Every structure is written in C-alpha cells, then in structure tokens.
C-alpha cells in the first residue's frame, strides 16, 4: 500500500494531517455525462464524490431526487436554494458550516498552502465613533516579505484611509478588494482619539507566501525560561523551521511555553501532529495523539484510515513541560483546536483569550481526475471527525473551547509581539510567574493605547478573502 499522508488545515478556515495513513487513495469517478443541462454533468460528479467521501454520506438524498440543473457552486456561498453543492450539505450552515467549494482548484490549493495575491496583512476593523460611522483598521499581522512589510507596515499600525478615502461602515469590506495598488493613510492615538498622523505607506498586491512561524523569543523571569511562539498557520513546508525553533527553545532550557494561536485558523494535520510531538511531556511514540472517524463506506474500504495517529519521535521535543499556555481568539480553529484537544490527556493546557472557533472535523481536496480535465472545480467537503486518546471531541460547537482566562484582545493599537503589556501575553506571564505586570509600560508613562468596546466589524481579517479559511483537510497522495 502506498503511504497516505494525512494533513489537517485548522483554517480558518483552514485542516491538514500528519503523514500517518496507508492505502492507495484516489477520488472515484462514476459520473455519467449528460446533455440535459450545462450544469448536470458537473453536479453529477459532485454528487458522486460527496456520496463516496462526505462524513454524512448516509444522509444524502438519492441523486435522482436532487436538482442537477442548479449552478454547481460558489466559494463561500450561503444560498443553498441556488447552488447544488451547498444543497447537499447536512443542515447547512449549522451542523455542517465548514464544507466549501471553489470554482478554481488552483486557487483552492494555493489558499490551503498560505499562498495568495495580496498586500499581505491582517487587520481588525472597529468603529471609532459613537455614531458607528467611521471605521479604523488596526493591523494585527503582517506577512514576512510581503508588499505590506516591504512598504514598512507593522503590527500596531492604524489605517484610517485608503487611496485618500476615509474608511467607514459602507466601504470597509470593499476598499481593499477593489484596488491593486493602495496608499494607506496612517493614524495615531492623540488625546484619546484616533486621528491622522500625516504618514502614508504605499504597496502593490503580489503573490505572497505566508511564513507561519512568525515570531519567537525566550524570556527569563526568575527560574522561569519562557518560550513564546507566534504560529499563524499549519503549513507543512515550514515544519523544518518549526523544528529548528524548538531546538533553540530546548538549547536555552525553556521550561514554560506560550503558544500564540490567536491568528491561526488551521492547516495541515501533519503539522499539528508535529507540534504536538515537539511539546508533549514524556514523549512516547506508543501514545495516541488522535483518532479519526470517517463514514462507514470509507472505514470499510480503507481500514487504516481509522488507525490512531501516534506521537512521532522528535529530537527537539521539550520533554519536561508540565503545562502549555495557548493564546486564542474566536478565529483559533481546527488544527489549532486539534493541538489543544490532543495534548489535554497528557498535560495541563491553559487557554488564555477568547472562545475558540469550534471545529473538530476535517476535509479533503477533491478535483476532477479525468484526462483531459472537464472542469476546474475544487471540492473541500468534511470527511472526518477527530477525537483524542480519551475519546473526547466535545468542542465542535460555536462556543469552541472555553478559555481558562477570558481576556479581551480589544486594546488598540495592537502591541508588538512579545510586548509584556500586550493583554493576552501579559496574562500568561502573570499566571506563570505569579507577578502582576502593569497594564501598560511606556517611556513617558502616558497611555498610548485605548480600549474599544464598540462593535468589531472584522476580527483579524486578511486583505485576501481566500485566506479566511478555518479548516483541517486530507490530501490525496501525489
């Protein structure tokens, strides 16, 4: 049997898995071409794939009872009465709020790998005034080597205008999408209000590869050597870099770890399993990380898919951690949640921040395998559910994991990564050391941040919609 590498992209959303499964796996294609409708052949193919792989395949209606004349689908579309793919989903968008389709398989696979055409930054959009008219973009993340970073943009910047246009409630969702080159008008906090600083940055969209191993450092506090890692997406191409960082942590004697997953919507399950193996206390390759539940058809045909995934032998495993601190947001999803759930049976996992997204299921990428290719659709249906070594998988609701310490990430502008007054990081340090850290540390002792309790319109949103994924997924062997 050929090795089947399961990858989990946790999203979001994106779910990718560790290389642990064996069996030859290819999408079946029993589609009968018809000429009754321009959509019927593609929809018939979509149905056959869903009947084979979909986690809730037993709940699908008979193909003859579906409307094969519907438009096949649209990425992120919610109108199940109009689009065939979404009409098949189980109780969409409630029970299955995760399966999706993209009209271009290349765009789909690129997004799962963190590749996009974008400026390369993530922002939170918040109303700045009581009338809820003016909006500010607070930059939370800038991709390394992206056009935004090269232009000088950084976490903590405030964007008030784009190409001279004030951001407001009517245009905040469209200004970035409608321009290839943008001049960003920056703001500052002055006398309690966010006003123009007179500074601008200019950038042009380009193909960007997200480097998810974004920031790390070691902080010494008494007898505590605290490793801090900002990890934004589970992408297997960066596994070697991840191992290297943990090697540095181990060499420096790290005995506490803060894993910042607040911007991590998912990724390869293989990378989630790798980081679990680097973190777990008393690493034992006979111990189970997680087990995957597939539909009855797949479980019968490919028995090894339900074989539990076990920890891998990692030379840079930290070894002696008694606990793990995870920083979270509502966008912490799928593969990120898999790490939390997988490690809980073996060590204390302390969650600081907000409720996580709530995604305990994973998907696969399916494309037309015929020669020549008949259509460019890419399907990303949910095909499995994960549970940990104790059989636990109870976080798959919209409440996700409940934090041990609920800390709102609503102090703007955002503090730099590793700043000890940054709210979530600050709380983790306080729990670790038992010492209270001042709410803010500035040179002139004046407040340079402001808490905003007004409505958040977009939380940690990429400037490219294709990177909104919160998913875990399996890929077919090459």
Question: Language-model segments: which ranges?
Answer:
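Bacterial Sec-dependent N-terminal signal peptides
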Residues: 2-40
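Terminal peptide-recognition signature
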Residues: 46, 121, 148, 156-159, ...
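C-terminal "post-core" interaction segments
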Residues: 228, 233, 237-244, 248-249, ...
């Amino acid at each position: 049997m050929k090795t089947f590498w399961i990858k989990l992209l946790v999203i979001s959303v994106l779910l990718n898995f560790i290389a642990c499964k064996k069996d030859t796996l290819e999408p079946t294609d029993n589609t009968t071409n018809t000429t009754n409708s321009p959509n019927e052949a593609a929809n018939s193919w979509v149905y056959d794939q869903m009947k084979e792989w979909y986690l809730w395949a037993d709940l699908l209606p008979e193909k003859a009872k579906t409307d094969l004349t519907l438009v096949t689908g649209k990425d992120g579309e919610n109108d199940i009465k109009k689009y065939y793919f979404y009409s098949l989903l189980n109780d969409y968008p409630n029970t299955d709020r995760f399966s999706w389709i993209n009209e271009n398989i290349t765009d789909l696979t690129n997004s799962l790998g963190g590749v996009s055409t974008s400026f390369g930054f993530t922002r939170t959009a918040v109303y700045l005034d009581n009338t809820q008219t003016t909006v500010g973009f607070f930059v939370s993340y800038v991709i390394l080597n992206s056009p935004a970073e090269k232009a000088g943009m950084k976490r903590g910047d405030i964007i008030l205008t784009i190409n001279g246009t004030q951001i407001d409630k009517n245009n905040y969702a469209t200004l970035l999408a409608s321009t290839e080159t943008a001049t960003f008008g920056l703001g500052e906090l002055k006398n309690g209000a966010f006003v123009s600083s007179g500074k601008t940055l200019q950038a042009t969209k380009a193909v960007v590869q997200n480097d998810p191993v974004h920031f790390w450092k070691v902080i010494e506090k008494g007898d505590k050597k605290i490793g801090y890692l900002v990890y934004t997406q589970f992408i297997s191409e960066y596994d070697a870099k991840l191992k290297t960082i943990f090697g540095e942590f181990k060499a420096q004697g790290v005995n506490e770890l803060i894993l910042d997953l607040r911007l991590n919507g998912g990724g390869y399950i293989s990378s989630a399993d790798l980081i679990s193996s680097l973190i777990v206390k008393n690493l034992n390759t006979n111990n189970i990380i997680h087990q995957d539940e597939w539909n009855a058809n797949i479980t019968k045909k490919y028995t090894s898919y339900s074989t539990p995934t076990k920890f891998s032998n990692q030379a840079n495993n930290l070894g002696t951690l008694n606990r793990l601190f995870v920083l979270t947001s509502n966008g912490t999803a799928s593969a990120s949640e898999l790490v939390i759930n997988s490690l809980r049976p073996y060590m204390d996992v302390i969650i600081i921040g907000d409720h996580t997204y709530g995604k305990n299921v994973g998907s696969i990428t399916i494309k037309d395998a015929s020669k020549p290719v008949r259509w460019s659709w890419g399907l990303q249906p949910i095909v499995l559910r994960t549970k940990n070594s104790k059989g636990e998988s109870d976080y798959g609701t919209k409440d996700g994991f409940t934090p041990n310490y609920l800390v709102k990430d609503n102090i703007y502008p955002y503090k730099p990564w590793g700043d000890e007054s940054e709210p979530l990081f600050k709380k983790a340090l306080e729990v670790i050391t038992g010492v209270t850290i001042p709410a803010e540390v500035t040179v002139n002792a004046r407040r340079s941040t402001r808490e905003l309790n007004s409505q958040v319109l977009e939380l940690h949103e990429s400037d490219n919609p294709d990177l909104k994924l919160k998913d875990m997924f399996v890929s077919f062997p090459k």
